[in-house]
């Protein structure tokens, strides 16, 4: 009798345990926690066996855990793109969800105020999630995309299909002889219909009268900076004319030898950079900038050179011009221009300038007033070289003349300093030997 009673109690206990397990599992399923069910059932099977055998039912010992993602998933965040840049715009995703990606392969491109940056994959795997769409702004430090780590199989080699043999031409079938039937009589000619009179009504185009194109981020930033420059600086422009005869003769005489020795062509821009560097050293206020109530004098001469690029005008910087030779400057101009044309300029290539040179003459501009590139205090404008009448020793002669324009911030640069600066550039370029002698 006692054995039967004990058996009944054990059966009731086991039924209670089974009932609790079913209720717990149902609750988990209703909460869509499949991972929890797997964890619950797999890791606790041995515990339940011991629990059933020992008739020890205690629901408080059951723990639930929730898993949100795999340990193999890597979330890539928007990287730092420079001290002054906090956000950018997604211009293109080169990979979509489900695509395989290898280490260092480009996944997307982000356009900033200055340059476009390619974002590479840090690991190999599969793209499982994109956190932004093309055209959306993203902030530095925010989630950009997610990769499930894994080996990516090499692309199979595709053999070129063998050329199929041309089918043999079939033997020509002899044409059947024409049946001997009487020819039909020719139909009577009908009179040509009278042409309808042409309509005099003119049709108007029903197409759209305008086309809207969203400004690129770099164009928006350029517009904002130029407007800020106009609103902040007290801009004034002074002009002078430059006789290019001596510089053009020097270039004509030494250009082949220069290119043979240094591997780069002898251009006019390097001469203007050297002349500007000499003038900036003599007039350091032109190389300065305004920060609140302070005037900041820059000890190094870092000159931005305006370059036309596919996305618009960019101004990469040539650093430490005071330490560079003609050849060094030409090589740096060539390197930066190539990067600009290929839309491959880095952030470091465009920041830290103290003075800017813009050459509108390459587009045929005769005259213009450039706008200061903030936070700088001055900009030099070059223009087209044209043969013009010029007075030399009391005689009118024809000389290749370029008009120079210097726009400066009148808050810190006086007219005397600006005119003296521009005249120094004129004197150096009209007497190129001054560059060699640093006079």
Swiss-Prot record:
It comes from the Eukaryota. Its cofactor is (R)-lipoate. One of its GO terms (cellular component) is mitochondrion. Signal peptide: none annotated. SUPFAM superfamilies: CoA-dependent acyltransferases, Single hybrid motif. Pathway: Amino-acid degradation; L-lysine degradation via saccharopine pathway; glutaryl-CoA from L-lysine: step 6/6. Residues 163-216 are annotated as: Disordered. InterPro entries: 2-oxoA_DH_lipoyl-BS, 2-oxoacid_dehydrogenase, 2-oxoacid_DH_actylTfrase, Biotin_lipoyl, CAT-like_dom_sf, Single_hybrid_motif, SucB. The modification N6-lipoyllysine is found at residue 114. It holds the Pfam family 2-oxoacid_dh. It is found in: Mitochondrion. Residues 1-47 form a transit peptide. One of its GO terms (biological process) is tricarboxylic acid cycle. It catalyses: N(6)-[(R)-dihydrolipoyl]-L-lysyl-[protein] + succinyl-CoA = N(6)-[(R)-S(8)-succinyldihydrolipoyl]-L-lysyl-[protein] + CoA. The keyword DNA damage does not apply. Residues 73-148 form the Lipoyl-binding domain. NCBIfam families: sucB (TIGR01347). The 2-oxoglutarate dehydrogenase complex catalyzes the overall conversion of 2-oxoglutarate to succinyl-CoA and CO(2). It contains multiple copies of three enzymatic components: 2-oxoglutarate dehydrogenase (E1), dihydrolipoamide succinyltransferase (E2) and lipoamide dehydrogenase (E3). This is Dihydrolipoyllysine-residue succinyltransferase component of 2-oxoglutarate dehydrogenase complex, mitochondrial. It comes from Dictyostelium discoideum.
